[in-house]
């Protein structure tokens, strides 16, 4: 089986069995085609049924120089799914991406309001009725306790 046949079967699986949207299928396919292109440019002829983990690691090392860790994680995840499909359909015995870890992605701290912004927010509350008093209490609690609305 060559790469394009395997990719077509995988696309059919994603569409029919998993019910994914065309856009999702296109994104998964793009990541697999990125690997195929790299293999071709590197003169590596291995079929998807024979490719070894070391080759996948070389590819990931190559893309790590070009793209953000979040994109690397997405590509690794997509390749894991592709090779899991090949294992599930018994085209391969093992998944060469199984023990390859995605890069660690730090979590971004949430945006916070400045003291001035909080003062403006509290000043904008209409305190002439009980609902205004309630709203002020809610804002004071959220701000004072460091809570956030999600």
Please state what every model-predicted region is:
Residues 1-150:
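Conserved catalytic core of the tyrosine transesterase superfamily
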């Amino acid at each position: 089986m060559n790469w394009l046949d395997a990719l077509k079967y995988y696309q059919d699986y994603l569409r029919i069995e998993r019910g994914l949207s065309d856009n999702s299928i296109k994104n998964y396919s793009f990541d697999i085609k990125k690997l195929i292109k790299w293999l071709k440019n590197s003169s590596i002829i291995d079929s998807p049924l024979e490719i070894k983990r070391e080759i996948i690691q070389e590819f990931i090392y190559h893309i790590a120089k070009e793209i953000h860790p979040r994109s690397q994680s997405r590509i690794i995840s997509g390749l894991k799914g592709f090779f899991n499909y090949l294992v599930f359909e018994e085209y391969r015995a093992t998944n060469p991406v199984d023990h390859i870890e995605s890069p660690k992605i730090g979590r971004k701290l949430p945006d916070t309001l400045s003291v001035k912004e909080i003062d403006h927010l509290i000043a904008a509350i209409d305190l002439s009725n009980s609902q205004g008093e309630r709203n002020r209490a809610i804002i004071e609690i959220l701000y004072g306790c460091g809570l956030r609305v999600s």
